[in-house]
Amino acid sequence: MALRDSKIADTSQSNGFESDNCADGADVQPYTTATFSNITFVGPKVLDANFQNDPDYITAGAYNPNNGSALGKFQAAMQIRRSSHLNCINSVALGWPVGLIVDGEKGGTVQASKDGLFKLQNVYFAGMDAVGSDANKIYKDKLYDAVNKKFIDESQKSYSNTFFFSQPGNKYFDSWSSLVGLDGYTPIAGSPLLGVASFTGWNGFDNVSYIGAFDGSNNWMSGWTNFDPQNTQY
């Protein structure tokens, strides 16, 4: 599970996954080809009804060291770029500004997605401002040329949106409230996340029936995780 403080974001934009093959985007082996399954990304909007993706709001609050450290904005649940071939299956992302960026600024990531060299399958998004964006720091779900830094056609959805919905089992929900409870990550009774996972064609995983990190009845974090370490007396 990935859970972020809504008032702390990286100066270079905060993402759930930010996957590169190499810094300059070179389309060379060995490729980044990790495969992730059953991830739950809890975005900044889920547990903060007042969230604003703005530097005036993202101040780090009481945890700001006041040493000049720069903060930034939240961006995407998944940014796959620079020739990465990262795969993700049976996972859910909730309440991010952007769901997916297949970033074509450097390298061959866009072409790799078209050639089926990486896959996003049985991935559910909910409560995004934009399902997809085609470039870093572009928050519009519009078809965009990341190399030449211009919109191709603002009447069309982003390529990232098109790719997301072309993949088997992917779905989008307007709100996460039909998926998870008030804690932001546990599936509620009857949640669409339950009973729909698929591992067909994927090896090396314990096959479970649910999408995301939790099955709705067993919170494996209980007893050993702490969400308030600053105020805990050890």
Please identify what each model-predicted range represents:
Residues 1-234:
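Extracellular beta-rich repeat passengers
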